[in-house]
Every structure is written in structure tokens, then in C-alpha cells.
Amino acid sequence: MDVYEKSLELHAKLRGKYEVRSLVEVKDREALSLAYTPGVAQPCREIAKDPSAAYIYTRKWNTVAVVSDGSAVLGLGNIGGLAGLPVMEGKAILFREFAGIDGVPVVLSGQDEDDIVKAVEMIAPTYGGINLEDICAPKCFSVEKKLKEKLDIPVFHDDQHGSAIVVAAALMNAHKLAGKTRG
């Protein structure tokens, strides 16, 4: 069985690569009233008074949306958002496994630049950051630019910044191996 067949088997068996789990054990009425109603009203009031309190009272502080329209999926091309969902789930688990960050895949059904920007703007309050993934060039650059102008959270364009980091690391290592010093 090759890697593709094994991967297909894994995906079919697990039916996805991540799940949402509760951090609160709701075992009785008191626990329910603290996690949900009526107790949840107080964190809501605090956030309404001071929006930065969302970083204290919610998972916003550690949650990143992995957003894609599926228009430039590595090795597959323009396969659309839904077909790209396994890739976005994979990226989400990389965030969790290697950085301890809760990545949430968000695939879009359309590929219009303004629609992408609007969709991300609308969901942004939930997240502490946005990771743009597999959006075709040159659209990806203008989507990133517009989102950085409009949002108050970090926007990371994975295909651009991730590649730049890898190239910079390779050049730094080559420089070191060649016995060169910075200066």
C-alpha cells in the first residue's frame, strides 16, 4: 500500500483529523450554570465593556483560523475550498501538535477576492490570528494586505511568509557552514 492509499485509509477511518473538546466538565447543574447560562453573562459583560477581555475569558488568545478558498493547493491546483479541507485540517493539527495553538480550518465556497476579505472580516472576532493558506497569486497578496489594514489581529500568509522563513533559514545555515560571519 503506498502513501496515498494509506492516507486515504487514515482519513476514512478517522473521518477528519481534529475535534473540538470541552475544557469544562459539565457534570451537574452548578457546572452548567458556570459554563453556560446564567453565569456566562458576566464574561460577556466584561468583554462588552472592554473587548480586549476576550483574550482573558475566551480561547481567542490561542485560536487561529486556517482560511482557504482552495484556489492554489500545492500539487493539486484550483480544487476549491471543500476539496482542500483535508489540507486545512492538516495545517490545523500542525498548529496544535507543534505550537500548541488551536487551529480551526475555514474553507470558503467562493474565490472572489472581496468575498474572501468580507468572510474573514466577519469571522475574525472569534480568532487571535488568521492564517491564509493556498489562495492563488496574485489575489493572495491583496487579500492579505486588505485584511492587515482592516483587522486588529495578526494575518499570516502561509505560502508567502512560510516560504520566506524557510529560504532565510537555509541561507543563514549555508552562511554558517561556509564559515562566514554576519556583518
Show which residues each predicted segment covers.
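Short internal alpha-helix immediately C-terminal to a glycine-rich phosphate-binding loop
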Residues: 164-183
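N-terminal ligand-binding/catalytic initiation module
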Residues: 1-153
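Active-site nucleophile and cofactor-binding loops and adjacent substrate-binding regions
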Residues: 156-165
